[in-house]
């Protein structure tokens, strides 16, 4: 979003990406840098994530950070890879990822229905996914994207490789001014974080598929016929990934031949520490994915969020938050947690009490009136989930050509 910080060194020009991109100084510099082939120029800045963390994580002193990419890197990636990202968003869930996924408008039903073919499988929790990304995996994802982007000009390939090489040896600056170089790990917070994470997770899924296929058919990997393997994979395994989140279901033959422990060995072999979210194969409706399990509402699959997390999200660390912003927050949580009936009733009571408390004082306040317009009824939220809407019809997304 253009309202976010612009990254180093552009703070001296403006506080947001929009302010920086509108400045003549940035525009002139960017044109010269672009014409030169986008040579390496990034110093990434890092900051702590402000979030509510489980007590167990705090006791282990486990904190999370994100990395801020310079605005010129973000803009160049958007210009070069934007169409590729659009195509990925239009392709879910057929390609096994959830980029572009929207739980509303029957999106959750569409996503989960894929797992009816094989009802039992597993969901995994990979620890420190971004920081565990190995160099070979970064290189693979980079070359994969460049190949699929199918650049027509050699100069664009040079630009793409220069931009993506910033991930391999990243110069990082901490809030207190220390500078160091990072040689591995996927930078959290850059333009392609989700894309790289999904591609890495998909690759690991296919590595697992190759192992299973070779053992069942007593073949060596180098002897596999690709077309035959792909047909087998699509018939025997169903999976979906979003970043480090993954859920998979397997055919009865695979579940009878391999234990869940056998399946998870692929992660440490690829450099990741993994923990199964169940002790054995479980039904797809109780597998956590994107922070949700699945329930059925009026014959549709719908998301059921963890109640404890939703209750924690009501806590606001900023005591100066104005009543209109709090009301918007309550409405947003109500939409997310709609299918937890008891919690939904609690939220409706909280919203009613909050409006009663502040409505007279803020009755002429524009922000308060705007916040009141976000107060959807139960029926409106239900329609938001259960009414189909094709948000991005094929061919509807156009981008200006980079010249």
Q: For each of these PLM feature ranges, what is it?
A:
Residues 1-403:
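Viral RNA-dependent RNA polymerase
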């Amino acid at each position: 979003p253009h309202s976010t910080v612009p990254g180093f060194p552009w703070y001296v020009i403006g506080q947001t990406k929009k302010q920086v991109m509108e400045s003549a100084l940035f525009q002139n510099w960017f044109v010269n840098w672009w014409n030169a082939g986008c040579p390496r120029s990034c110093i990434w800045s890092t900051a702590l994530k402000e979030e509510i963390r489980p007590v167990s994580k705090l006791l282990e002193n486990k904190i999370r950070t994100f990395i801020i990419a310079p605005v010129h890197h973000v803009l160049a990636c958007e210009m070069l890879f934007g169409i590729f990202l659009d195509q990925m968003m239009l392709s879910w869930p057929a390609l096994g990822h959830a980029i572009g996924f929207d739980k509303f408008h029957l999106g959750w039903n569409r996503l989960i229905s894929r797992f009816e073919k094989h009802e039992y499988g597993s969901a995994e929790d990979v620890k420190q996914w971004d920081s565990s990304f190995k160099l070979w995996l970064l290189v693979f994802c980079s070359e994969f994207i460049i190949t699929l982007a199918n650049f027509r000009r050699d100069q664009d390939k040079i630009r793409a490789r220069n931009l993506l090489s910033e991930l391999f040896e990243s110069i990082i600056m901490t809030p207190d001014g220390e500078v160091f170089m990072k040689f591995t790990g996927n930078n959290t917070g850059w333009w392609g974080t989700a894309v790289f994470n999904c591609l890495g997770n998909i690759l690991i899924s296919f590595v697992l598929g190759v192992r299973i296929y070779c053992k069942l058919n007593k073949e060596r990997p180098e002897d596999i016929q690709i077309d035959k393997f792909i047909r087998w994979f699509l018939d025997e395994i169903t999976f979906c990934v979003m970043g480090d989140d993954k859920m998979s279901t397997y055919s009865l033959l695979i579940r009878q031949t391999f234990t869940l422990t056998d399946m998870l060995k692929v992660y440490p072999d690829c450099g990741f520490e993994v923990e199964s979210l169940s002790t054995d194969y479980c039904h797809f409706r109780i597998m956590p994915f994107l922070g949700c399990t699945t329930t059925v509402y009026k014959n549709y699959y719908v998301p059921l969020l963890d109640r404890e997390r939703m209750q924690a999200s009501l806590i606001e660390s900023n005591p100066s938050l104005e009543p209109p912003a709090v009301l918007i927050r309550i409405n947003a949580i109500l939409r997310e947690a709609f299918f937890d009936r008891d919690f939904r009733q609690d939220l409706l009571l909280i919203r009613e009490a909050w409006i009663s408390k502040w409505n007279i004082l803020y009755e002429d306040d524009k922000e308060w009136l705007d916040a009141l317009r976000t107060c959807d009824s139960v029926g409106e939220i239900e329609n938001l989930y259960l009414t189909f809407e094709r948000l991005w019809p094929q061919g509807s997304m156009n981008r200006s050509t980079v010249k």
